[in-house]
Amino acid sequence: ALPISYSLGGDLTFERYAFKAGWASAWKKIKIGAEARFRAEHEYRTTDPRPRNIVTDLTLLFGASAPLLASHELGLTGGLRFYKQTNNVAFLREAGVIPEYHMLGLGMDYKRFSGNNASAYYKATGCEVGIDLVPTGKSGLMFSTQYAYTPYHRILPNLNALPISVLGVQTLKGEVGWRQGQRDGWLLKAAVCHERRTGNEQIAGSSSSTE
């Protein structure tokens, strides 16, 4: 998500905790599985300006696979992503504060809410799907594609939880290759990744010729 920016810099300290767990089972020729990934991150600085960013990121994936013809196995996956981030900036020095800027990307900021709006939070619920085709024997064609979409909503809590922008991130990945042998074999593959970002800003409040 796009940050709150200011004119003074400095190093940041961060703590990150992550875990991943999975489960798999089989019923006749059908295989099923699930996976959970969680990340928590805390980023801060002890000198002015003092940002404090807290992130929680949870991804849940479910999948199933079954034989396709006699030489391959087809797998389908789907999942959800739950993202939340809080962002606060504090000033403790006697000299006062400096303006904060809510960035919109491409070097632009939201002038209507820049200045003393030093708090924001972001939330998103995304989804992803995937298809995999793998050979069941020692050799064969391999194919994989994944699509994910996550809209990040930026909200100002000090203005009655006013949503001011949405950042939509779409990701498309694909791989195709050939596997020859297993223990002493080789694998040749080509991969491509495409990401598209779209922004949507909300116009709120009364108009002003200076904004």
Name every feature range the model reports, one short phrase each.
Residues 10, 41-55, 118-122:
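Outer-membrane beta-barrel proteins
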Residues 13-19, 52-58, 123-129, 149, ...:
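Residues that define the transmembrane beta-barrel architecture of outer-membrane proteins
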Residues 19-25, 60-66, 80, 129-135, ...:
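Residues on the lipid-exposed face of transmembrane beta-strands in outer-membrane beta-barrel proteins
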Residues 27-29, 38-42, 80-84, 147-153, ...:
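Transmembrane beta-strands of outer-membrane beta-barrel pores
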Residues 28-34, 70-76, 127, 137-143, ...:
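Outer-envelope beta-barrel architecture signal
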Residues 49-57, 91-100, 159-165, 204-210:
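Flexible, surface-exposed loop regions and adjacent strand-edge segments
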Residues 155-159, 164-168, 174-211:
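Long, charge-rich C-terminal accessory regions
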